[in-house]
A protein has these predicted regions:
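Structured soluble/peripheral alpha/beta segments that form catalytic or ligand/cofactor-binding pockets
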Residues: 1-318
């Protein structure tokens, strides 16, 4: 129990890694995200599973890339689930999720004709909640509230893709969200989150809202100390060949302790979920980015959202 409490983020408790009571919004949502990259195999893994109980729908997106080339892809947004869905929200379609220890260990199992796996995630850092950065939607009234936390950890297990057995041992991430409410006000965001190693992690979430609000969430974890971001500058280069895809991001961040880092990122395999989810009307793309900080490589989330092509940012500053 003491180990579990060591990993609980600010503003949450042990029960928040379990399922949550369904809220009143028509598109109230609970979702689970798991991602890693194996540099030795150049293997990229990303899976997102969620439920909309009030709409009777579940969704699952799962991609496996090698060197940026898709080897397996599933994007299904219309699983039928009951409106009173309980713990079975962790197990529909081919994916089964199981919380072994809250905020410490999760198990992922998958059973489909081409892809099977059995993986465990073990946390190596305390989870980070957007409540810690005082994001307004975390404390909004019922019907507007939306909660989020994310966590760095270690993946182990096996995967079988088209008959090829693959041993997995890789640094990666997971995150959780529940509620919808204020997220409907999103008007674009850019997320960069990279564990270069257990001793160096950079987490940046730059968000714009339709009512004009902007907010920066994130942290630098370095030498066993984590501090919230104080400022960030993100310079984005868009691909000339792929109009909605980022080619490169140059980043400079400073945290509350005065530590500054300059890093760059480029996306590897890109997952385009734009206009697939029934509750969203933005261009939303996920990827694993290859990051560089002073010659050291790292691999982590690189996600971006925009509503119209004219709103694609070139520079974001906080």
């Amino acid at each position: 129990m003491s180990e579990e409490r060591d990993f609980v983020p600010v503003g949450l408790d042990l029960t928040d890694d379990d399922i949550h009571a369904i809220g009143p919004e028509p598109w109230w949502r609970e979702a689970w995200y798991f991602e890693f990259f194996d540099p030795a195999r150049r293997l990229q893994f990303q899976v997102y599973q969620g439920v909309f109980p009030n709409a009777g729908r579940g969704d699952l997106t799962l991609y496996v890339f090698t060197d940026g080339r898709p080897g397996y892809e599933l994007m299904k947004m219309d699983y039928a689930i009951p409106s009173d869905v309980g713990r079975e929200r962790l197990c529909f379609g081919p994916l089964k999720l199981e919380m072994l220890e809250p905020f410490v260990r999760w198990r992922l199992q998958y059973d489909s004709p081409r892809l099977q796996f059995d993986l465990t995630f073990r946390a190596i850092h305390r989870a980070f909640s957007w409540a810690e950065a005082k994001l307004w939607m975390e404390e909004a009234p019922v019907g507007e509230q939306s909660r989020h936390f994310d966590q760095v950890g270690w993946y182990e297990g096996w995967m079988n893709l088209d008959g090829e057995e693959i041993d997995i041992a890789a640094l990666g991430m997971r995150d959780r969200m529940w509620g919808w409410g204020a997220r409907a006000l999103w008007r674009g965001y850019l997320v960069l989150w990279v564990p270069f190693s257990p001793s160096l992690v950079v987490n940046v979430a730059a968000m714009n809202f339709a009512d004009g609000r902007r907010q920066l969430c994130g942290y630098i974890h370095q030498d066993r100390e984590r501090a919230l971001l104080r400022s960030a500058r993100l310079a984005i280069t868009w691909s000339e060949r792929r109009w909605k895809s980022i080619e490169r991001v140059e980043v400079r961040v400073t945290d509350a302790r005065g530590r500054s880092l300059a890093l760059s990122a480029r996306p590897l395999g890109i997952i385009d979920t734009s206009h697939h989810w029934p509750h969203r009307f933005d261009h939303l793309l996920f990827s694993i980015g290859e990051y560089d900080v002073q010659g050291t490589k790292g691999y982590g989330c690189l996600t971006w959202s925009f509503v119209t092509a004219d709103e694609r940012p070139s520079v974001i500053e906080f």
